[in-house]
């Protein structure tokens, strides 16, 4: 395959003589322009940026003056001109490039300060199709890519956070920038345009219902660097995609240390689970460890929901993540701070609750500003060696399914409620998952086992341990409903559930041996329904 090859010398220091400034986000731009002007840098600009700099009383040249071509088509075409791009792309030490610049009257541009139309914000705000398309920047990305490619000679700034470092360099090096700085800024510039284009391409795919586009790019903006990843020897950072889905990426940290990699992963799992329970129907609480629930419950009040969730497995809850579907109040906060907890996340927090949690300064408190919609469409992604697995979010809701009673005995109204509750929780448990529930409370959770029978047994064992801790005569699995997130392949799993005391079973169905499982349920007088929807989770 033929490739383009050209060796370009990279001088260490390059003096900034001419700067092109064209920004939508004008944060700090006047101060930057003033500092550059004070150093004798010639300023070129466009549109609204030109007006802002002129209004500050600074000398600035409109790009149309150097191109000899006016802005046209509502500003769609203003910098897409050889005079601009030649000034950005010219190799200063190449005699042919120098000759071309002289021949065509092109002036070298040493600094490009560019940021883009707010496509991400318009998309997140639900802008209509024409408005969203109109906010796709064309000239900005073109200039960023051109200047960043020529970073041997040109400095590219795409983030107002970098203005101060530029000015420090100019002060320290007599108006010059170092190659290492230009190189870093170029890398940042290409990352910015890549993320921008990824957002646009994904928006088109979603809007046009293109499930498997020929190319898929998932972009994000760095929110924070982390001390380490899942383990101390792993490096990690948290990126946000711009999706305005209430949760750990959008929540405000009201107190406590920076969230760790594991905190973020677990908090996301906890909040997505608790959002399955509508706050207007009942308060709900989910307690998570290692991305698996160890207790979930509803209650007549938020504090009751917390107490009931904790009762399922108070040992595993130590050092866990607590997610609530309603505003954290003082009474609930008083209960939570009695136990060592890593993170609390809720839609909102009362001032009284904040004061109570403040007694535990290391306890991280997050206010998410709302609950994620469990029915909303979206994507999930997972890296594999040399690839990326992308799928639509599991937004199936048991309330939307047509449940099929497959046994002679139909479930009672209470059993049906508990079935739905258990199936909701099971959707958020690592497979193989078995969840016992009774009266809006998990009685036992079995997660992540290679055998579904083992998950059923572990869940029953957890219920027995909870019964002993609570002084109950029998475990709560007695008279409970039980959910399996995938079909029961054999009757042995069902028999384990019956042995634990379950009287009703909810599962997707679809096994070759469904009839064998149904027959076993009928033999023991157990009610069973099929959902027709599986919830594998890996």
UniProtKB/Swiss-Prot annotation:
Q: Ranges for the MGS-like domain?
A: 8-158
Q: Which GO terms describe its biological process?
A: 'de novo' IMP biosynthetic process
Any one GO MF annotation of this record: phosphoribosylaminoimidazolecarboxamide formyltransferase activity
EC identifiers of the protein: 2.1.2.3, 3.5.4.10
Cellular component terms (Gene Ontology): cytosol
Q: Give the InterPro entries listed for this entry.
A: AICAR_Tfase_dup_dom_sf, Cytidine_deaminase-like, MGS-like_dom, MGS-like_dom_sf, PurH-like
Reactions this protein catalyses: (6R)-10-formyltetrahydrofolate + 5-amino-1-(5-phospho-beta-D-ribosyl)imidazole-4-carboxamide = 5-formamido-1-(5-phospho-D-ribosyl)imidazole-4-carboxamide + (6S)-5,6,7,8-tetrahydrofolate; IMP + H2O = 5-formamido-1-(5-phospho-D-ribosyl)imidazole-4-carboxamide
Q: Which residues cross the membrane?
A: none
Q: Does the keyword Hydrolase apply?
A: yes
Record HAMAP family = PurH (MF_00139)
Instruction: Tell me its family.
Output: Belongs to the PurH family.
What domain notes does the record hold?
The IMP cyclohydrolase activity resides in the N-terminal region.
Q: What is this protein called?
A: Bifunctional purine biosynthesis protein PurH
Q: Which organism is it from?
A: Rhizobium johnstonii (strain DSM 114642 / LMG 32736 / 3841) (Rhizobium leguminosarum bv. viciae)
